[in-house]
Amino acid sequence: MTAFLAVVRRDLQLAMRQGSDAALVLIFYLLAVLLFPFGVGPEANILARISTGVLWVTALLAALLAIERLFVSEYEDGSLDQLALLPLPLSLVVLAKVLAHWLLTGLPLTLLAPFLAVALGMDEAGYPVLVLALALGTPTLSLIGALGAALTLGARRGGALLALLVLPLYIPALIFGVAAVDASLVGLAAVPHLAILGALLLAAIPLCPWATAAALRQAIE
């Protein structure tokens, strides 16, 4: 556990020193959401109707911005070999790095979402479910994105390949995240959709780090 937390702390400290990736994600999320009122027009009912999808799709795209470089710096300077030699399974090292990535990107996106929902005219009844759905969905996006980042590590045009690999895998989280919020807005139970989001996360936690670790070992060799 000490080694796991040390990896999390290391990644957080490095990100705090550099700062650009996390800030870029939040700025992109903010600007992308706020562009929709200009594109759709001043019709409040239209904005409110599409607000859930807008918030989820832009969060999904924002999460892609920083995930590409999750392993790049370690791969380029050779420290990825050192991480593989830690007294910790490589899958847990991956999980620690994904946790740090989520704390820097997914958590801020989740906390920012209700404020942007106000700008889109979403009914306040949907705010709690929106936050809960993103809190369950964004870690899944980070875990899947980490697998894509490992598979495209060192590849030419890795960013485009990463998007092609992971965007289809993001669809289940997107569907049930949007469905949960929409259900709460019309007075239906959001619990079944949230339960599926939770199940997706529980499945991704053991599977994605294991597969990502295998891809990283292949990249190291």
Residue ranges and their predicted role:
Residues 19-41, 57-59, 165, 169-176, ...:
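Hydrophobic alpha-helical transmembrane segments of multi-pass membrane transport/permease proteins
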